Amino acid sequence: MAEKDHTEEPVAFAVRINIYHAAQDDPKKNTALRLSRRGFARIVTKIKFLPKRAIVLNPFSEIALSPADRERVEQFGIVGLDCSWEHAQKVMGEHVRGTSRCLPILIAGNPVNFGKLTKLTTAEAIAATLYITGFQQEAKTMLDIFPWGHTFFELNQKLLDSYVTAKDSTDIVEMQKELLTVQKREPAKCIFE
């Protein structure tokens, strides 16, 4: 399937999305830059310019993202990190404004890390955040600009739909524990379908 044309008009998007971009990879393949070009997100290159109270997608956070974070997402938006894990650790070590949350277990649908747990692109991570916090249509609209966007939802639909039913971070953690317990007993394909 050919890549969708990125010359379309930028969209008006209900949720404010900021992305800390460290310029560490090929700009032509970078999902954060494509989100910015299409009007879904604002690129930030300095930590000090990130919003104060937004949900920050922090892979090192001890608190999982859950539907309980919807109000904060709606009011203050989302901050995604577009950098290597090593750089993210350094960035998160600095004083980052906002409320840190880690994403629950999900499967990458992008062609680079297809099928790998937790190896999501910035766009996939933000779309997952939108979906889990109740902005399902916005999540699908966002990933629709990528030829592989539908694949992310096909791989993760069961997981995302279960995460949406969680009350809070504790429920998400329990769901993940159950998932990992089942995964030890059954082939991964059976669990994620």
Label the model's feature ranges.
Residues E94-E178, A188:
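C-terminal folded domains that constitute the principal catalytic or ligand-binding module
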